[in-house]
Every structure is written in structure tokens, then in C-alpha cells.
């Protein structure tokens, strides 16, 4: 459904926007990948990154399923005449997706990988997400090529790789795109930000009431002001500048590969 449109931002129009009743069909679809498939999330921070780094834009927008995460993108959708639908933030959606996939008809075919953060959080988070099933884990501070080799070395014939990447934006999107090119089989790659840390309970979630009104970012800023000051206090005004600039600039397009570009 569309609302009254003030702007047209091609990046926002690339989102897969869903209502709550569409979530279960999406989980079914993602649980039966027919090719190497990337799931990712666009929030205010990610939107800023893809304005500032051309390579990040290219990788980020090659994600097959780019989902709306947060109140900032909700407002951007409204300005672009789009019904924002459900807020599919990764911290809630990813555990639901993994549980759904592992209990689907293909559940026993999945081979599980976790990439990101550092030990013991990598293994603790993976164990929580994967329900105690066996998995292969590697921290998030290795050269990019090491992740490609890590997956290739551990792949088993006939298995479907399910790879959770918790390296943060935009590195995890770059790794996912490289793996997508390398894997010649169905696979599910999930760009999860701090999902392994949250699953390991390294960081606390905001109370449910705060999450419900879309203000978890403010809670996180309060808990980690030094680390998140630039992301939110500086980043939020930047975000609205980019939204308005891109929505009004006729020299903006999206290539067939999904990359955001500015025409010369």
C-alpha cells in the first residue's frame, strides 16, 4: 500500500516491506533457498554508510532480502509514499528465522556457521541461536579471504550452509556478497550486526516497552554513549539530510545489480 508521496528515494524503494501477516510466508520462503541467498537489514546507520562509501553501497544493495529495521527507515518510507509495514529488526527476526529454518522440512540439511564478534561471545551466541546444534565458528577480525576459505574448508556434500554474520556493517555485507559468488549451491546468509553478542547476552536489550515504540536506539545510546555518539547524535541529522537529498535529486538511480549510483 502506498501513502501520499513527498520524495522518491530509490534505496528506500528497494526494501522488501511486509505486514505482520506476511512474515510467516517469508520465513517459509527463506527456509527453502534455491540459490545462495542473503538476508540483510537497513537501518538509519546502514543508510548513512551507503551514502559515504561506494563499495559499501554496492555490496549492501546486492542483498536479496533487504528488510526495514527501525523508526528512521519507517519515517523514510512514509516520506516516499510507502507503507512501512512491520519492523523486522535483526535482533528479533534472526532468531525466529533460524528456529523456523532448523525446524522446517530441510532442517537436517543445514550446516551451521557463525562469523563475528570475539570469543567467548562467538561460540556462546552461536550455541544459543542454533539451539545447541553443532556449528563452525570464527571471530569477526580475520582477513576477508579467511572467511571464504573457512566456509569452503568445512562445507559438506549435500548440505545447505546457514551462515550468521555478526561482523557489523558494512563488512558483513561484503563477506556475504563474496560468499554468494563462491557458493555453487543453495545457502542462507544472514547479516546480523551484533546478533551474536545479543544472543550471548553480552549486551542487554532495551525493555519491551521501549522497543515497542521504536526507541531502542535511544536506550543503546544511553548505555554506550561514547561508542554510539557519532552513530546517533551526529548520524540522525545526517540521515535526514541524505533522505531529503536523495529523494529530490533526479541524478540518482539504482543499477540492475541494486547499487545506488549518482549519474554524471
Regions found by a protein language model. Name each.
Residues 57-61, 104, 181-185:
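Short, conserved loop/helix-junction motifs that constitute active-site signature segments
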Residues 139-146, 185-223:
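Short, flexible loop segments at boundaries between secondary-structure elements
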Residues 74-77, 205-258:
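A transmembrane-helix-recognition feature enriched in membrane-embedded lipid enzymes
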Residues 1-94:
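N-terminal nucleotide/polyanion-binding subdomain common to many enzyme families
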Residues 43-47, 167-172, 195:
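Short glycine-rich anion-binding loops that position phosphate/pyrophosphate groups of nucleotides
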Residues 147-186:
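A contiguous pocket-lining binding segment that forms or flanks enzyme active sites
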Residues 73-154, 158-159:
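Conserved beta-alpha
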Residues 36, 107-110, 184-187:
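A short helix->loop->beta-strand "cap" motif at the edges of active sites that frequently abuts
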